[in-house]
Structures are given as structure tokens and as C-alpha cells.
Amino acid sequence: MTTLIHVLGSNLPHHNQTVLTFFNDVICQEMAPSSKPHFMVVSDDAQLADAYPQLKIDVFANKQAIANSVIQRAKADRRTRFFFHGQFNAPIWLALLFGQIKSHQFWWHIWGA
């Protein structure tokens, strides 16, 4: 089975809350996934995951920390896929440019508030 990880790579609470709430309250209720959707999120709130019990959330203190973790996961298993929601994280873009994250692993969606 392919691993899919959603990445919110910047500390933008108003954007991140919208995405997390939608997945927690709508996707998980309507689709009843077999496992919790996995998110990696930059946030000042270390307890962020408590607000979204239907999701598996890894919280990172800053953009570089999340980029390092994404790169490590991407290199460890090239079957892992990442869905980047509104990506404002230069280290992640550079990792894609220089092949640390392969293009087949990188899905991106831009959105606004």
C-alpha cells in the first residue's frame, strides 16, 4: 500500500486550520478511511493534534524541521507520496529541484483563504 502524507509546510494557522478541520470533520466522517489521514504540519501549537482526533498529525517547529523530515521520509521509501497543500516552504522546493524528493512523490495544490 502506498503511503500518502499531507504536508502543511508553513505556520499559517488560518490556512492549516481550514484544511485540518475539513479532513477531520468531513473527509473522515463521510469516507470512513481505514486509517487516519497523516499530516505533517508547521505550528507553534505543540498540542495541535488534540483538536483533530480523526487525524494523525506530526507537528514541527519550523519550515526547516519539516523539510528535513519530508526529505528523510522521501529518501527512505520512494513509494511514499506527499501532498503539499499551499506550499510556502523554500527548503522543500529546493529538495524537489535537487532530487532529494522525486517528482513522482510530489503532489501539490495551491489554495488561498
Regions found by a protein language model. Give the residues of each.
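Short beta->alpha connector loops
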Residues: 12-14, 64-65, 86-90
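N-terminal subdomain of nucleotide-sugar transferases
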Residues: 1-49, 77, 102
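A short, histidine- and acid-enriched strand-loop-helix "catalytic/donor-clamping" loop
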Residues: 110-113
